[in-house]
């Protein structure tokens, strides 16, 4: 284990309500930022140090900011409001769709349509058209059309489903958006800021955190990191929905990385200054996490 991790283990920490442990964040590779040459100076406050020219994110701050973000979305959903999940790049798309749809929240996991927030009336027209086509299919009316017309409508349906399918049940503008990679989703972030919609985001070391209402510093490229952070946010939304509408989120008691939080008995991490928080991580785990980061960065470049 490197000196960096030894130093990290012995850093004094404050007692806090923990949604997910630092160890779980570490094993998911959340601490791996980008290469130092891609570092954004505005992210310096969230960086613990560097290792092999890779910026290492301070997971104590990640945990703290993630807990704050989780509390925020739970509060939003407890009032019957909606959080829109946004993650269109390859490493985020599947997770965003699976997690958001599991509790009926809106999401955008394909291409972000310009005007989704700033020109909602036009987007709503596309959503209405999607509902009309779905009604044609469910009622069997589409079978009465000639083959050419039916094929054209099916193509239109596929196109609309890809572009607005994740937000087809959204009745109006969301009360907050959760974003994976603010640099990649800059148009969505700009639209949210213009409309006064709070932005909660997973922000990597190469991004600009300015203008983001709630920054969760962390690896926004590796699938394991994205899945863990998104899962915490979704579970917090589920708790909010449960308290507002009697919604019962699916159980996740068997998850090895998420701690179950009971409202009556909150879990408090009490860490003495001399106690190590992060258990020793094997070289194999470190290398695997680094390779995952590099692979995701390569995929990111291919997407562009």
Placement of each model-derived feature along the sequence:
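N-terminal cationic and glycine-rich segments that engage phosphates or anionic surfaces
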Residues: 5-82, 88-89, 93-136, 147-150, ...
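Residue-level signature of catalytic and energy-coupling elements of molecular machines
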Residues: 29, 85, 177, 229
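A generic "alpha-helical surface" signal
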Residues: 64, 151, 224-228
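Alpha-helix N-cap/loop-to-helix initiation residues
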Residues: 92-93, 185, 222
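Long, charge-patterned amphipathic alpha-helical coiled-coil/hairpin "stalk" segments used as oligomerization
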Residues: 103, 108-214
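Short glycine/threonine-rich loop/turn motifs
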Residues: 188-191, 195-247
């Amino acid at each position: 284990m490197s000196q960096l991790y030894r130093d990290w283990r012995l850093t004094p920490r404050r007692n806090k309500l923990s949604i997910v442990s630092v160890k779980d964040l570490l094993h998911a590779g959340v601490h791996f930022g980008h290469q130092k040459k891609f570092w954004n100076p505005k992210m310096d406050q969230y960086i613990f140090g560097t290792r092999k020219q890779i910026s290492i994110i301070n997971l104590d701050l990640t945990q703290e900011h993630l807990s704050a973000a989780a509390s925020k979305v739970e509060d939003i959903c407890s009032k019957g409001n909606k959080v829109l999940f946004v993650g269109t790049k390859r490493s985020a798309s599947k997770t965003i769709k699976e997690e958001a749809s599991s509790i009926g929240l809106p999401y955008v996991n394909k291409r972000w349509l310009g005007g989704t927030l700033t020109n909602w009336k036009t987007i709503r027209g596309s959503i209405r058209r999607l509902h009309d086509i779905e009604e044609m299919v469910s009622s069997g009316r589409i079978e009465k059309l000639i083959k050419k017309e039916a094929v054209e409508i099916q193509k239109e349906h596929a196109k609309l489903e890809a572009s607005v399918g994740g937000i087809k049940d959204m009745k109006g503008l969301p009360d907050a958006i959760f974003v994976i990679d603010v640099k990649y989703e800059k148009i969505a972030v700009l639209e949210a800021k213009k409309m006064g919609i709070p932005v909660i985001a997973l922000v990597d070391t190469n991004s600009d955190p300015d203008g983001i209402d709630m920054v969760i510093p962390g690896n926004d490229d590796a699938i394991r990191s994205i899945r863990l952070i998104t899962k915490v946010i979704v579970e917090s939304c589920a708790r909010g929905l449960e308290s507002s509408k009697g919604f019962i989120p699916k159980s996740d008691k068997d998850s090895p990385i998420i701690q179950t939080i009971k409202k009556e008995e909150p879990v408090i991490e009490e860490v003495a200054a001399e106690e190590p928080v992060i258990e020793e991580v094997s070289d194999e785990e470190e290398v695997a996490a680094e390779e995952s980061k590099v692979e995701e960065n390569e995929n990111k470049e291919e997407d562009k």
